[in-house]
Curated annotation (Swiss-Prot):
GO MF annotation terms: 5-oxoprolinase (ATP-hydrolyzing) activity; ATP binding
Organism: Arabidopsis thaliana (Mouse-ear cress)
Protein name: 5-oxoprolinase 1
EC number(s) given by UniProt: 3.5.2.9
Gene giving rise to this polypeptide: OXP1
Entry function: Catalyzes the cleavage of 5-oxo-L-proline to form L-glutamate coupled to the hydrolysis of ATP to ADP and inorganic phosphate. Acts in the glutathione degradation pathway.
PANTHER family xrefs: 5-OXOPROLINASE, 5-OXOPROLINASE RELATED
Amino acid sequence: MGTVIEGKLRFCIDRGGTFTDVYAEIPGHSDGHVLKLLSVDPSNYDDAPVEGIRRILEEYTGKKIPRTSKIPTDKIQWIRMGTTVATNALLERKGERIALCVTKGFKDLLQIGNQARPDIFDLTVAKPSNLYEEVIEVDERVVLALEDDDDDEGSLIKGVSGEFLRVVKPFDGEGLKPLLKGLLDKGISCLAVVLMHSYTYPKHEMDVEKLALEMGFRHVSLSSALTPMVRAVPRGLTATVDAYLTPVIKEYLSGFISKFDDDLGKVNVLFMQSDGGLAPESRFSGHKAVLSGPAGGVVGYSQTLFGLETEKPLIGFDMGGTSTDVSRYDGSYEQVIETQIAGTIIQAPQLDINTVAAGGGSKLKFQFGAFRVGPDSVGAHPGPVCYRKGGELAVTDANLVLGFVIPDYFPSIFGPNEDQPLDVAATREAFEKLAGQINIYRKSQDPSAKDMSVEEIAMGFVSVANETMCRPIRQLTEMKGHETKNHALACFGGAGPQHACAIARSLGMKEVLVHRYCGILSAYGMGLADVIEDAQEPYSAVYGPESLSEVFRRETVLLREVREKLQEQGFGDGNISTETYLNLRYDGTDTAIMVKGKKTGDGSAFDYAAEFLKLFEQEYGFKLQNRNLLICDVRVRGIGVTSILKPRAVEAAPVTPKVERHYKVYFEGGWHDTPLFKLENLGFGHEILGPAIIMNGNSTVIVEPQCKAIITKYGNIKIEVEPATSSVKLAENVADVVQLSIFNHRFMGIAEQMGRTLQRTSISTNIKERLDFSCALFSPDGGLVANAPHVPVHLGAMSSTVRWQLKHWGENLNEGDVLVTNHPCAGGSHLPDITVITPVFDKGKLVFFVASRGHHAEVGGITPGSMPPFSKAIWEEGAAIKAFKVVEKGVFQEEGIVKLLQFPSSDETTTKIPGTRRIQDNLSDLQAQIAANQRGISLIKELIEQYGLGTVQAYMKYVQLNAEEAVREMLKSVANRVSSETPNSRVGNSVTIEEEDYMDDGSIIHLKLTIDADKGEASFDFTGTSPEVYGNWNAPEAVTSAAVIYCLRCLVNVDIPLNQGCLAPVEIRIPAGSFLSPSEKAAVVGGNVLTSQRVTDVVLTAFQACACSQGCMNNLTFGDDTFGYYETIGGGCGAGPTWNGTSGVQCHMTNTRMTDPEIFEQRYPVLLHRFGLRENSGGNGLHKGGDGLVREIEFRKPVVVSILSERRVHSPRGLNGGQNGLRGANYLITKDKRRIYLGGKNTVHVEAGEILQILTPGGGGFGSNI
């Protein structure tokens, strides 16, 4: 037992998934007590946090506390805890059994979500499972009033947000009772409720809650109470998360509290929330608990390092076993209102913590000539090879081989008796086996290649892992307008300090900070946090003097509420501070920013507008002119300042730091005899030159060569990182297998950052919110190097565009030129997709291209929205631009581009065709595309500065060869499979498969697929395809090319780079004059959105990969002279050999998002009667096809509606005995209740009160179930 103490202890606890960390502040002791326990160890204790407190109390009170007895609390001042109970329950889907209650007509709303697929190349379309087991619909409906609605009958009601509404269907409680009883009979007593427009009219949700509780439900989560913000889908998902997790949390907390005397009634107990604030047990709920542990780490590094150890903004880097959390701090916590965790959207204030699937457990693989790290993890069981459980090689194994992990300082908890150290021998053996494979491959590429050693291979994998973790750090900083290199890296977590120097150097950072408690910083951070009370309500108004007076009134009410809640917890006025926020957006955009109030010059009021404009310009790079600011929400935050832990200074250093011993550690260039120091034996002012190891408890801090570690006044480690001074020299005549992976990451990262720049700086809904764009970089010959995975129909297609421009302009390209094109004959898809191309020169020589393609909402043509269903010639579809320099020698050619867009050429026999109806939006989005290209250029130039132009261009070629190899291997495998299943298909070395399908007009897509089994080459011969059609579903050749490259990438099913190499072993033959290679005059608007889907179905059917999907994008446009709206509607995906097709999702060649139902009704004159799955529309089979969707829209004013769709005649086919999916259908229901079939392509003038009903196709089934 230790010395008996006077006073009371303070406990900070982080109950993680694997370990529970306990930090206790002991009265009279200069240092805290640190304890690390297994979170689950049932043979020794029931609960790790309780056990940690028990052990520490025993040690410092001198009293034995039996595990079976309650723990005395007379020596406990407070307990603060973060817990992964909620996170684990969400990840493992082990929450409470719950049901969902929704407005009638929206039973499937949360399952559909925004329609988007999580991974566009995953043919199984794996989506997270629903949290709810059952759904019940309540008969009620609230409708927002239109601006010109009168109130003759006095039926208008003013909602919480200030919007006027009508209750068109009162709450039907009697009808709901039997449905609730049915849930109780099934053992479900927890309910999540989301009703349409409850953010502004919560009464019906409250009626549901009252009735449910009266009938015996244990817990009800109301979306309107949890997050009163417009958008039903994220609000509803948040309610399901809360209903799913809160009972689990309450049960755990109740069990924890019951282990103490008096149920901790006299001890202040607080729990960490996702927003970095503490809350008492009574206010700790599921939707605010998911980031409980990571939030403690952010509080920990921000409150102990920023301002004390550095003035630079900090990047938090928390590397664990399976993932790494990245965050940022610059004097205030960066928060988001909405994020996605474990595949589920949560809408609540939370710290902006980005997670990447790379950690100590990330698997190491050598595939297709490149090193790959993750995203799969070996997990805690069996873990890495060194854990002695038969695991696979992981990052931890690489660190062990290099000497970054020291077995002497790692707990001996492995082996059958859990008493063995890490297994170095087994790890080396596994690496030696892998080295054999790698060196055989390298010799096959270059007979003179020298064998790589185990250490070189391990270092290579660590380098690739570091680059994987650098990508989210660059994204976190640069997408918000910050320079990454101007930050310091705050490193914590078990594995982070081993990688910190290398990551900082790669990012251009000069400073790394490692907290003295880095291994338990999340626990330590609990003691630095304040109690937070948040309150928010919707308010919809134009920002201005009149609305601000209402804002201040609402703020006053909300501030009173949070103050009262804090006062109830014992906070006096002197310990309470408050913050106010407005959620603001520009009119016509969906991009809202939560703006913290700042005092005006005279201190009399908060000037939210000025702060919004500043933040908007910083994040998006521009300001919008002549646009109103709209208020969305009013929010206040009450802060109860607590008695936090205080940083303690350490003693000044003796003359020479004590070296414990030396170890061999492998760095770039070879082995180094490296001294090891213990942090506990180092003092303020000690300086340690790298290479060195500093042991900090269970954390290993690696100080690399050319770095210097300094012990600070507070006992933390500051590492000065010497930046790379010269470019890296690599051989250009052969690809280095490590650098190949790193360049893959760098090239893809550049394309992704271009995409984020375009999304940030664009203003149109199509680009900014629906994400209908794509960005890429190209080698000097126009070959695709990297294409970020945005919209599949754009993938690979831009290479044809770049090469056409290269041929067209020839020597007439100059530095400072930017090209624009959208014409199908110039490699375009359809006219709304405008491509901006920037050639880049070095010393007068063309060295690469960057390009961005975005869907512009308007480019002219015979109908608003430029998507006419009945166009017969290209000139009817809008402005068609083959080649134009939108920037010439650095000067933006506004007059020229305006002329092209506003005065498109038309056929001489026709009347004039209208030009674009939104020229300012076109100009703004073109400038956004130019900015995205410029971002790509600057990033590639940084790469060239680091490696040299020759090396970068060489690796532009090598990444293409790498992708080519992957596709060749896949084609060989497919050929062998097909020939074994159907021997007659093989002649010699070749396998031949023929497939065809029919468009709704009877046109044939015919494919003869021939695969050379030896060479891994394929011919896609579309000879036999029908001629050009007198309609608009002709598809330019680039569309078919995009469909083929998409299919190949899906079939490879490995995260290879998407580039020109994917098409290198492929020949695509398209007969000229067919509707897949139409004439220059052909109408093509439907080819991109309809025919592309049908080509994809034919290709995947030929490969026997999966049954046909819905085969359509179900394009809907409507509007009048004052507005326009465009959407694509999902459907059913085809089933495959081992999976059912996914229902109600965007399939294959698109992945654009659906507008939330509440936003849809708020901004447009519509009433959405139904949006749900079209049950049983998927084809039956051994594996069932996915169901399509039903969408019923009532128009509340006269509009012109256009529908452009396919699969209304021919059904999506099943495969291998699977049945066909149901074909789609489009109907107009008139005011006199007639149901009129519209066919697949039509334009109709709709009157107020008429309803459009769209039934999208289901997917085909796979395999016979007979």
